[in-house]
Amino acid sequence: MAKGTKKSESTTAAAKKRSLFVDLEVCAKCPQCVTKCTYFYHPGNNGVVSVREHAAMSVVCRRCENPVCVSVCPREALERDDGGVLRRYVMRCVGCKSCSIACPFGTLLPDVVPYANSVCDYCLGRLQGDESPVCVTICPLQAVRFEEMAGELPKNNHVVDEHLVVHAIPWKKEGVK
């Protein structure tokens, strides 16, 4: 096996062990988002919006047993995954705000679920070159980091998917201990 191939494989393996870590509490303290994303397919779009949406939805959504927002969507743009987290199909969404109006808790705000969006690829191309994602290198408060997440996660850290871990204080139902 060639040396270059071995390095490429080890770099890819290392990239798979690390996750994008978004601290929503720190991120909320930032007066304005200065994070810019050079998402390959949408160079003019801030791809971080997609990561923030995904992170926020995983901790803000009340995960209703029978989510009304999903059933009222005329374009079937919302889907509830096995973990109860809502996922939005951006190409199906027409921005009608039916989901926002139907949400009994008021957590699906148009500001949280923007119409124009891209899908973050976690800068996988940069990871193969052993570089961090652009949002990580630019975030002034280090609310977005790229780090190893091995073993049991600290309290209030939530795995959203294989590349994303979110830190946020979760909501609690009233009367439930």
Where are these regions (language model features)?
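Glycine-centered helix-boundary capping/hinge motifs
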Residues: 31, 76, 95-97
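N-terminal cysteine/histidine-rich coordination modules
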Residues: 2-27, 31-51, 56
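Acidic (E/D-rich), amphipathic helical modules within compact regulatory domains
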Residues: 37, 45-91
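Flanking helices and flexible, charged tails adjoining ferredoxin-like Fe-S electron-transfer domains
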Residues: 1-17, 56-63, 70, 91-177
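Acidic/polar residues at beta-strand termini and the immediately following turn/coil
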Residues: 23, 81, 89, 111-112
